[in-house]
Regions:
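Positively charged n-region of N-terminal signal peptides that target proteins for export
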Residues: 1-4
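Hydrophobic h-region of N-terminal signal peptides that target proteins for export
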Residues: 9-17
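A short, compositionally biased
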Residues: 17, 48-55, 109-111, 157-159
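Sec-dependent signal peptide cleavage junction
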Residues: 17-24
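Secreted/periplasmic proteins
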Residues: 24-98, 104-105, 135, 140-141
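Exported/periplasmic cell-wall-interacting domains
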Residues: 88, 92-98, 102-167
Length: 167
């Protein structure tokens, strides 16, 4: 009984304080607070975004799983979601590589947005300033940022997590 109560208290606390988290595999396991640049193990909050697949996936902070298609990155036209255009500034998708997610914020009125911090090993092609944010992929909402239209999906993304961008 005490163990269940202990886990429930920590679970409720994790919704209030985003700096604390549980591993996806074991919700009773406490993980130390993380900074934005903290490295994460492969079993802890690893998201994947496929440029050409328009697909974002990974474990949500609440224990559910995010598996959403229809995301976009890059300006509309032949370069949107096109890996061969990733080095075209303000046109192509977010360059492939590994990123750390910043804290949840509001960007241009869109709640549940996250800054993306590239790993030093990424080839950024002289590009910077990427985010995950909302908007309608039917327009031109992105110069390379990842656009996830559904607000409740963005809300479930864990700040401080790692994102792997693949072709």
């Amino acid at each position: 009984m005490f163990r269940h109560l202990f886990a429930t208290v920590f679970l409720l606390f994790s919704f209030v304080n985003a700096d604390f988290m549980f591993s996806y595999d074991n919700k009773n396991e406490y993980i130390e607070p993380m900074s934005v640049n903290a490295s994460l193990s492969a079993t802890t909050y690893l998201y994947t975004y496929s440029q050409s697949g328009h697909h974002f996936s990974g474990p949500a902070y609440d224990g559910s799983y995010i598996d959403t298609y229809g995301c976009c990155s890059g300006q509309s036209g032949s370069c949107r979601n096109n890996p061969s255009c990733q080095c075209q500034v303000s046109v192509g998708p977010l360059p492939q590589g590994t990123y750390s997610l910043g804290n949840m914020m509001t960007f241009k009125g869109m709640q549940y947005s996250y800054e993306l911090y590239p790993a030093s090993s990424n080839n950024m092609c002289g590009r910077s300033g990427f985010l995950i944010h909302g908007g309608a992929c039917s327009g031109n909402p992105s110069e390379g940022c990842i656009v996830i239209e559904n607000e409740s999906t963005r809300y479930k993304i864990k700040s401080g997590a790692t994102l792997k961008v693949v072709s």
